[in-house]
């Protein structure tokens, strides 16, 4: 690795490379309190429980039951001494066993499909987490950029007002025409018109950060001072060679495809017979004290067979449905892969172009700064009026505004790039 190469970025905590403690705190709050993430975590618990059900279906079920009944027979219907006393008791206690023998893999495929659904749900959670954390970083970037733009506009307005006062004085004394005065005043109003939209955008960014971190917007504030995020020279390595391993939405589609494949196999298994085995063992007696005697025991074993014969194409249609769903998921998987590659290429291209733009703006800013220093030197020497120095100051403030905006776009493109890479899903541990 050359000396000018960027350091490898840990995609687990990519936002820490900005070295902004306020951003780190906001990310931690979002990770712990975001309601969309909390909902997604509960969906994992639901799907895990369903997977446990499908796993349990592979094994026999054992039930315990016990009953007591007392009944009287009708003398009109059963008037016979061979039936025993008219009023009788029946004590029953025992165990029932039921088991579907999965010879053709129906239950095994349903279990495998449920397992794939569980993994897909976990990847969906990670995908949402990546989106939420990227939204936090993006809105924080917007907030800091709007903050710096507002400060720059105040300075521009202040300089323009000073220039306007000088133009008024010169026009009143007849040394200049009123054209410059009205032009400068129009420029001041144009600058002042930019302030309300900027304040609205700042408020929107703050409110969005409040929602992302699980707080009420009216009580949410960003504490501490900060600068616009520095994103120059920060680029992750291995792009896009490991993209397919990192993006949770691609992994999710892979698991959904696996689940659809197993459900198709389970539907095909319905063409074949279903074997079952049931049995029971227990004790039955008419007297309580005879309940657990050896002669009171009873048992039965019942093998079962069910084979579909005539269903007018229901099973075949069900197989066709599952096969079509499987192909649909396959096409969705291919679309997600292409979209992921497109996002990475677009964000990477934007990032590289913005770096070039910022480098040019910095050279322009440096030239205007030197020009302003020369104009100020000429003014102090009595070689040029103050308005010339002020105009040069406004020029470099205007370039500074563009530089802030370019850095904002650069940070947004870098955040979008990390989002499109999907992070390191292994960092999130076992869900």
Which role does the model predict for each range below?
Residues 1-50, 147, 175, 228-258, ...:
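Bacterial Sec-pathway N-terminal export signals of envelope proteins
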Residues 23-25, 46, 90-92, 138, ...:
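Transmembrane beta-barrel architecture of outer-membrane proteins
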Residues 38-39, 55, 101-129, 179, ...:
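Sec/SRP-type N-terminal targeting helices
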Residues 107, 116, 123-239, 350, ...:
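Periplasmic alpha-helical coiled-coil/stalk elements that build and connect Gram-negative outer-membrane
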Residues 171-178, 379-383, 420-424:
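A short glycine-centered flexible hinge/capping loop motif at secondary-structure junctions
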